[in-house]
Amino acid sequence: MSRISLSEPWKKLVWVATTVCNYNCTYCAPNLHDNKNRWPENYYPVIDMINRFRKGDPLIVDITGGEPTLWPEFETFCTDLVDSHKNKTSIQFTSNGSRSVRYWDRFSAPIDEMAFSFHTEYADTEHFYQIAKSLHLRYNTKIFLMMPPNRLTEMREFYDRLEQSDLQIDVATKLIKHHDGTGLVDGYTPEHHDFSVQRINRTKYNKVKTIDTSTVLYNGDKISAQDLINTKQDQFLN
């Protein structure tokens, strides 16, 4: 029998830190931007809870919202969380990228990976390009192009600009799902689906030392977890 184990003993915690958001996207679940749940006034109990959860293991903390960067103490929270434990704490977060370029120029939190969702109902392509330019040499930076059916041309143009740049970023396109989990919204064509599988992969994950969540030990050898899935070697019979 083959033995599969994690290549590093990590855990992952996803935290919806706030439902305060400056966007009101039509396809976003209402409870994620209802502005009812603000960030904690005192975040040290949150750090204590996180460290109890990890039980000494290396930990990935994925922070979402709402919009996390609206929290005035977001950067200091990240710094204090990393400093609170001797083992590795890898912080990731998702943002709509709406803060000013000046904000991102000054951003210095100990983040291992930041993901930006480009929402065509509000976001500006030039602004997004400039924040990617500000961050790509300092952070592992991903951009997800959220593509409603009527924005294919705009998404293609922005994707092409990013692809032709020298920015060390990852870019992927996401088709919009109903927020109640009933599948994709109506209006997508084969052209949309063909475009949605295109990827830009240029971060190389070389800015910081991250916890490796993409590989496992398979009979003692480190291999890609996705390769196991693709070849159905992750499936077992009773």
Feature annotation, model-predicted:
Residues 47-50, 75-79, 104, 128-133, ...:
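Generic structural signal for well-ordered alpha-helices
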Residues 113-238:
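Radical SAM enzyme [4Fe-4S]-AdoMet core and its adjacent flexible, acidic
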Residues 32-41, 56-71, 82-101, 109-128, ...:
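Core AdoMet radical
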Residues 51-54, 82-85, 108, 136, ...:
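N-terminal cationic-hydrophobic initiation segments that often serve targeting/anchoring roles
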Residues 1-14, 228-238:
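N-terminal [4Fe-4S]-dependent radical SAM core
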Residues 43-55:
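Short microdomains enriched in Cys/His and/or Lys/Arg
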Residues 4-44:
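Canonical Radical SAM [4Fe-4S] cluster-binding loop centered on the CxxxCxxC motif
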Residues 3-15, 49, 58-70:
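A short, flexible N-terminal coil/short beta segment enriched in small residues
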